[in-house]
Swiss-Prot record:
Keywords, comma-separated and alphabetical: Host cell membrane, Host membrane, Host-virus interaction, Inhibition of host innate immune response by virus, Lipoprotein, Membrane, Myristate, Suppressor of RNA silencing, Viral immunoevasion
Pfam family, one: Gemini_C4
The protein, known as: Protein AC4
Region of interest (Disordered), ranges: 44-63
Species for this entry: Potato yellow mosaic virus (isolate Venezuela)
InterPro entries reported for this sequence: Gemini_C4 (IPR002488)
C-alpha cells in the first residue's frame, strides 16, 4: 500500500469574508495514477487560466514529493499579485 497523503489549505483575502478551505486525505497504491485538479476564481484577470492540474504516478516515497509540489505551486499562485486594469 502507498503512503498516506493528507493536505489542508485554508486562505482568505484581505478583509473579505470569502474563504477557501480544502481538505483531503487519501492513500494511493504504488503505481496508481493520480490527478489533482484545483479551481479558484476570485477577481479573475482577463486571459488567465484559473484551473491547474497536477498528475503523476505514485510509487513508495514519491507521494509526499508530489503533494509538496502541488502545495508549493498553490502557494506561489496565492502570493502572485494580478495586474490591475
Amino acid at each position: 500500500m502507498g503512503n498516506l497523503i493528507s493536505t489542508f489549505l485554508s486562505s482568505s483575502k484581505g478583509n473579505s469574508t470569502a474563504q477557501i478551505t480544502d481538505c483531503s486525505i487519501w492513500c494511493p497504491r504504488p503505481g496508481q495514477h493520480i490527478s489533482i485538479r484545483t479551481f479558484r476564481e476570485l477577481n479573475r484577470a482577463p486571459m488567465s487560466n484559473p484551473t491547474s492540474r497536477k498528475t503523476g504516478t505514485v510509487s513508495n516515497g514519491d507521494c509526499s514529493r508530489l503533494t509538496e509540489e502541488v502545495l508549493e505551486a498553490d502557494s506561489r499562485h496565492q502570493t502572485t499579485q494580478l495586474p490591475r486594469h
